[in-house]
Amino acid sequence: MSDNPQEYELDWDVEKRLKLNDAGLVPAIVQADGTNEVLMMAWMDTHALAYTLATRRGTYFSRSRNEYWIKGLTSGNVQEVTGLALDCDGDTVLLTVKQTGGACHTGAHTCFDNDVLL
């Protein structure tokens, strides 16, 4: 099994239900297994999604760095994917994960606990 997400192809039955944006990406919402707390939002392309399905490791595409990002590979804050679903329109992916360490790139538990508006 390769550690390069670009070498993974998404099953056609899944890919044909997926609605990617003009950049070839789909938003991915990540929830904590057991609590359903929203941990983060990231972007995936078909290779990141295929790699995630094959390895059960949260894998995303960084728009700012223009590269794949396997969550925890450098930080140790690994995501073990326990569930993955498409929404009714196929334009959003929902991942359920067992999170080790912080989910946010800042090291925080969630990306949504620092700037609460209501």
Swiss-Prot record:
Keywords: Amino-acid biosynthesis, Cytoplasm, Histidine biosynthesis, Hydrolase, Magnesium, Metal-binding, Zinc. GO terms for molecular function: magnesium ion binding; phosphoribosyl-AMP cyclohydrolase activity; zinc ion binding. The keyword DNA-binding does not apply. Pathway: Amino-acid biosynthesis; L-histidine biosynthesis; L-histidine from 5-phospho-alpha-D-ribose 1-diphosphate: step 3/9. Mg(2+) binds at residues 87, 89, 91. It catalyses: 1-(5-phospho-beta-D-ribosyl)-5'-AMP + H2O = 1-(5-phospho-beta-D-ribosyl)-5-[(5-phospho-beta-D-ribosylamino)methylideneamino]imidazole-4-carboxamide. Pfam families: PRA-CH. It is found in: Cytoplasm. Binds 1 Mg(2+) ion per subunit. InterPro entries: PRA-CH (IPR026660), PRib_AMP_CycHydrolase_dom (IPR002496), PRib_AMP_CycHydrolase_sf (IPR038019). Its cofactor is Mg(2+); Zn(2+). GO terms for cellular component: cytoplasm. Catalyzes the hydrolysis of the adenine ring of phosphoribosyl-AMP. NCBIfam families: PRK00051.1 (NF000768). This is Phosphoribosyl-AMP cyclohydrolase. The gene is hisI.
